[in-house]
């Protein structure tokens, strides 16, 4: 476990609690939406006339929204349980700006433009799995290649809202470990 300045266990525990609060707000909002849509569907069913094509269309649209929000709730609950498993610290060579991204199974954000956690399938996340520390690049479809200097790759073990452990690595991620984590969540 690392104890470098500014990235202590205490710092990481504070970050985890902050991220869990954001994830919980998303879960709560989705639960409210699911409840409201369930009530709307119930009310529509009570007043539903099978011969009214417009009512059928409204009901099908509400049902599709309900299914989407319910699926989003399940994703939010999963993200709440284990918000992230990795972190990358890097310097964008073009912008000359230091960045830190936490990586999880899905995005966690109050503001989508500045997520607390990025999705593991995001192009920038590929350097967590595929690159060693130092000068590396990643590609974004339709945008091209970005050059960065990767300075840290950190892996986390989070269980029951608690940071169990974390460690820094300078090697390419073990695909078996990643597969195990993603299968568990």
Regions found by a protein language model. Name each.
Residues 1-184:
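Extended, charged low-complexity regulatory segments
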